[in-house]
Amino acid sequence: MIIGVCGFIGSGKNTVADYLVREHCFVPVSFASVLKDTCASLFGWDREMLEGRSEESRIQREIIDEFWSERLGIPNFSPRYGLQYIGTDIMRKHFHPDIWVIASERVLMRYRDVVISDVRFPNEMAMIRRNGGKIWMVDRERPSWYDVALNAPEQMPEFYPHIHESEYV
């Protein structure tokens, strides 16, 4: 069984996936795993930092990598920016829109029960359904910051240099 979990930021997608892994022996698969492996190797970033869910790893992903920022001439080049830019702006837009979906599909075919907790795009949902999977939408009471975050990128884009359109709430 394949279960794709989607929902807004902070809704509990990983909590649902962790439960399925712990209690029902599901294998966790991520659309972003191959991208994170690639960026960790290319830029010399710690793989655990790219994957980590701790507050510390979230903060580290936002810190500008001065070495790469200077060498590439890209101000504000942080791990988060690098992941988004390479993942979406380069690979999805200029190589193949389904590159991460295809890479993940190849992985999930090896297992019987799989949970994917980072479902964000329609092509990801389509692949899950095409392989007989289900999409679970995690819906809980929206946090107090939700409405502010929903409109913030349109109101003050200059203050959000690391937010890519795929990350808007």
Tell me the role of every PLM-derived stretch.
Residues 22-29:
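Post-Walker A helix-loop "phosphate-sensing" segment adjacent to the P-loop in P-loop NTPases
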Residues 33-112:
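ATP-dependent small-molecule kinase phosphotransfer cores
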